[in-house]
Swiss-Prot record:
Entry-linked SUPFAM superfamilies: POZ domain, Voltage-gated potassium channels
BP-aspect Gene Ontology terms: action potential; potassium ion transmembrane transport; potassium ion transport; protein homooligomerization; protein localization to plasma membrane
Cellular localization per UniProt: Cell membrane; Perikaryon; Cell projection, Dendrite
Activity regulation remarks: Inhibited by quinine at micromolar levels. Modestly sensitive to millimolar levels of tetraethylammonium (TEA) and 4-aminopyridine (4-AP).
Name of the gene: KCNB2
TM annotation in the entry: 191-212, 233-254, 266-284, 297-317, 333-354, 396-424
Residue numbers bearing the Phosphoserine modification: S448, S608
Protein name: Potassium voltage-gated channel subfamily B member 2
Length: 911
């Protein structure tokens, strides 16, 4: 949605495969251009203010504003569209309505139709704690959640028991597992279901045969006159016992845990169902004599009665019977209480009825134990009528016994019934859960669906997660109030967030540090440790270079070399430190920000947006002040005005320099070293010394990316040295000043100055945005300044060097810097020299222009030299020794000579 498609690629192509991710400056610009943001949740669009989302900074939406890279955005949202300022979340749209209202009103409610666990998952996703639910929704939410958590806990225990059936430590584990599933899990396969049906049929057949053997018509008399089983029914019973025996042995052999198998209640029932048959056979066959048979006969009858326990084998295949057994086991407290009540009632009422009826003739209440039977059937409201009281007192006792029996039995019975109902539902739910889990596992093996682990999905919902995590590591460097990350609405910060807080470049920091790195990869890795919105321009350029190296389309540079072939240059980033200065301050005009970019594929435009030097314009702080920047240049070259009007595009520069040491300065005009690098896409041009080579002494590594870029850029970087001598102030400029503030420059000598000039290229006919109005004036001895007196901006006395790279799309030549010498009558003037020095195997033109002053008492203006000449003609006017051009960064009007009081015509210069 938010991609930039390179040339030659289809715009409909997927961003993740062929196109570059959006640049961080594009993301920053998209967020700062509007006070509102569009949030698309499951196809439902919402529009909300950024400051509303800032109320909960530690939530997912609160972190959205701080994500200024493609990777960090995709960690927070699922997709985004920078053109529409829209962010997409593939979540439940209904639940998000309640969550968004929490940002707006501070009240969190759960909708009636929402599932409790589903709403809890949404709260976890958006980073909001469930404890902030209002009281009207908390009871319903927590009740449903606890119920579901209990069911999930039971299911987890069941699954743990099933997962504990390990066959790895035994022989033939695969075959034994298949046999175990066939006998113990009827729903595992069709064969297991058939086997379970056959087992049920044998149980029913065995029960029917046992019942028919008791019929006299089907019995046979033995030699002792005792009835025996029918031979045909005996064969049927033998077959059934053989099946039960085989089934029991196979279960025992395939069981993963033999001792656990023996302790199982269903397995004990199976053993009791087959054991009496074998005991009976053993006793009858070992005692053939009449005397021995008579002694064993009663024992055999007991075991024959135990065969009726075969009917309990149906519990293996019936959930209801299993529930009944588990209910009796779980309700032993209630059953014990019921028996205790009955026993106490029987004892009391049997004693009362005995003393009431003992005087009657032919009474059946002969003793208290004989009265137990009457009390039992009376309290259970059965009343057989075989024994009853006859006296009035006995009848009253019988009535009280009936009432007490109803009350005693009615109290614990509902508890037992409720336990049975709950356990039965739980058994059915577990069966369905097991089926669902097995179906998911099969689907996972087939690759048709993603397996979901319910225990992991709802593990976090069982705990109260507080998202109020305090920031670490920021309190040491932050003055003022820390960021309130608590979710309580009473602690929200309702103050409007300043635009400077969201800018990509913080220009009002109190401390700066110097970073020096030689490897771009190392610098790129270091950027990941800091917040994306604090990336410097050089780091953003490194990031962009790393991205472009991976692309199949490389942009050739003017000398036909690829980006990868360029040698790595020593890069150093110098940042400044704020120093307190008692000097007076100069009001600096508001600067204008870069409001539009024609192309973001250029490195220069990329860094110009990233550094964002218009912080003073948007900041709520008062505008800082700066002293005058004083520059000394020789007189202007002829034809400067015509050339500048023909070459209107402004400059873009990215400065990398080392800080020089400081030495004592004399009250003289200080020399300035300027190295000019011109790299153009057009044909070569010649200067006064003939055509210049296109190779540059210190070529920027980003220049290879500009070969086919329509965006034209020029860059100038100048370091200055000053003189300690006094000089009158330069009047403040009414033109657009450089985006430099007093906070960016130290006002004492040993501090390093690094000025970055970033500007967008306008159309060919537009005037340069960076420039100053330059005037010529006569001698100004005794001149009274028109503006209030202010102190000069002082620089270190040592010579400072820098590069100036001017890239255009019209020419490919190097332009030449020339300076003129002051008349020899000026004793304190410095020579203007021109030298050529090779660097890195190439021969760039390095020019050193030195400027002098007429006298120590003369006005020391901030002069500026013509940087380059026109394309068609190059004029030199060495006779203009009495007039000097000023690099008027902050003043539009300059007097030509110290003694003049008039003004020369306005001349516009560009850096």
């Amino acid at each position: 949605m938010a991609e930039k498609v390179p040339p030659g690629l289809n715009r409909k192509t997927s961003r993740s495969t062929l196109s570059l991710p959006p640049e961080p400056v594009d993301i920053i610009r998209s967020k700062t251009c509007s006070r509102r943001v569009k949030i698309n949740v499951g196809g439902l669009n919402h529009e909300v203010l950024w400051r509303t989302l800032d109320r909960l900074p530690r939530t997912r939406l609160g972190k959205l504003r701080d994500c200024n890279t493609h990777e960090s955005l995709l960690e927070v949202c699922d997709d985004y569209n920078l053109n529409e300022n829209e962010y997409f979340f593939d979540r439940h749209p209904g639940a998000f309505t309640s969550i968004l209202n929490f940002y707006r009103t501070g009240k969190l409610h759960m909708m009636e139709e929402m599932c409790a666990l589903s709403f809890g998952q949404e709260l976890d996703y958006w980073g909001i704690d469930e404890i902030y639910l209002e009281s009207c929704c908390q009871a319903r939410y927590h009740q449903k959640k606890e119920q579901m958590n209990e069911e999930l806990r039971r299911e987890a225990e069941t699954m743990r028991e099933r997962e504990g059936e390990e066959f790895d430590n035994t022989c033939c584990p695969e075959k034994r597992k298949k046999l175990w599933d066939l006998l113990e899990k009827p729903n595992s396969s069709v064969a297991a279901k058939i086997l379970a049906i056959v087992s049920i049929l044998f149980i029913v057949l065995s029960t029917i045969a046992l019942s028919l053997n008791t019929l006299p018509e089907l019995q046979e008399m033995d030699e002792f006159g005792q009835p025996n089983d029918n031979p045909q029914l005996a064969h049927v019973e033998a077959v059934c016992i053989a099946w039960f025996t085989m089934e029991y042995l196979l279960r025992f052999l395939s069981s993963p845990n033999k001792w656990k198998f023996f302790k199982g209640p269903l397995n004990v029932i199976d053993l009791l169902a087959i054991l009496p048959y074998y005991v009976t056979i053993f006793l009858t066959e070992s005692n053939k004599s009449v005397l021995q048979f008579q002694n064993v006969r009663r024992v055999v009858q007991i075991f024959r009665i135990m065969r009726i326990l075969r009917i309990l084998k149906l519990a293996r295949h019936s959930t209801g019977l299993q529930s009944l057994g588990f209910t009796l086991r779980r309700s032993y407290n209630e059953l014990g209480l019921l028996i205790l009540f009955l026993a106490m009632g029987i004892m009391i009422f049997s004693s009362l009825v005995f003393f009431a009826e003992k005087d009657e003739d032919a009474t059946k209440f002969t003793s208290i134990p004989a009265s137990f039977w009457w009390a039992t059937i009376t309290m259970t409201t059965v009343g057989y009528g075989d024994i009853y009281p006859k006296t009035l007192l006995g009848k009253i006792v019988g009535g009280l016994c009936c009432i007490a029996g109803v009350l005693v039995i009615a109290l614990p019975i509902p508890i037992i019934v409720n336990n049975f109902s709950e356990f039965y539902k739980e058994q059915k739910r577990q069966e369905k859960a097991i089926k669902r889990r097995e179906a998911l596992e099969r689907a996972k093996r087939n690759g048709s669906i993603v397996s979901m682990n319910l225990k992991d999905a709802f593990a976090r919902s069982m705990e109260l997660i507080d998202v109020a995590v305090e920031k670490t590591g920021e309190s040491a460097n932050t003055k003022g109030s820390t960021d309130d990350n608590h979710l309580s609405p009473s602690r929200w910060k309702w103050a409007r967030k300043a635009l400077s807080e969201t800018s990509s470049n913080k220009s009002y920091e109190n401390k700066y540090q110097e970073v020096s790195q030689k490897d771009s990869h190392e610098q790129l890795n270091n950027t990941s440790s800091s917040s994306p919105q604090h990336l410097s321009a050089q780091k953003l350029e490194m990031l962009y270079n790393e991205i472009t190296k991976t692309q199949p389309h490389s942009h050739p540079n003017p000398d036909g070399q690829e980006q990868a072939e360029r040698p790595s240059t020593y890069e150093e980033e110098i940042e400044m430190e704020e120093v307190v200065c008692p000097q007076e301050q100069l009001a600096v005009a508001q600067t204008e920000g870069v409001v539009d970019m024609k192309s973001t594929s250029s490195i220069d435009s990329f860094t110009s947006c990233a550094t964002d030097f218009t912080e003073t314009e948007r900041s709520p702080l008062p505008p800082p002040s700066a002293s005058h920047l004083q520059m000394k240049f020789p007189p202007d070259l002829a034809g400067l005005e015509e050339h500048q009007r023909a070459r209107a595009p402004p400059f873009l520069a990215l400065i990398r320099q080392k800080g020089p040491t400081v030495r004592e300065a004399t009250p003289e005009y200080a020399p300035i070293d300027i190295t000019v690098n011109l790299d153009a896409a057009g044909g070569p041009q010649g200067g006064p010394h003939g055509p210049l080579p296109t190779d540059c002494a210190s070529e920027s590594p980003k220049s290879s990316l500009k070969g086919s870029n329509p965006l034209k850029s020029r860059s100038l970087k100048v370091n200055f040295k000053d003189s300690r001598g006094g000089a009158p102030p330069t009047p403040p400029s009414t033109a657009r000043p450089l985006p430099v503030t007093a906070a960016d420059f130290p006002l004492t000598a040993p501090q390093l100055i690094s000025t970055i000039l970033l500007e967008e290229t306008p159309s060919q006919g537009d005037r340069p945005l960076l420039g100053a109005e330059v005037h010529c004036q006569g001698p100004s001895k005794g001149l009274t300044p028109r503006f209030p007196k202010q102190k000069l901006f002082t620089f270190s006395a040592r010579e400072r060097r820098s590069f100036t790279e001017i890239d255009t799309g019209e020419d490919d030549d190097f332009l030449e810097l020339q300076g003129t010498r002051r008349p020899d009558k000026q004793a304190d003037s410095s020579p203007n020299c021109l030298t050529d020095k090779p660097s890195d195997g190439r021969d760039p033109l390095r020019e050193e222009a030195c400027v002098g002053s007429s006298s120590a008492q003369d006005t020391s203006h901030n002069c500026r030299q013509g940087i380059y000449h026109g394309v068609a003609e190059v004029k030199k006017d060495n006779s203009q020794e009495g007039c000097k051009m000023e690099n008027h960064l902050f003043a539009p009007e300059i007097h030509s000579n110290p003694g003049d009081t008039g003004y020369c015509p306005t001349r516009e210069t560009s850096m």
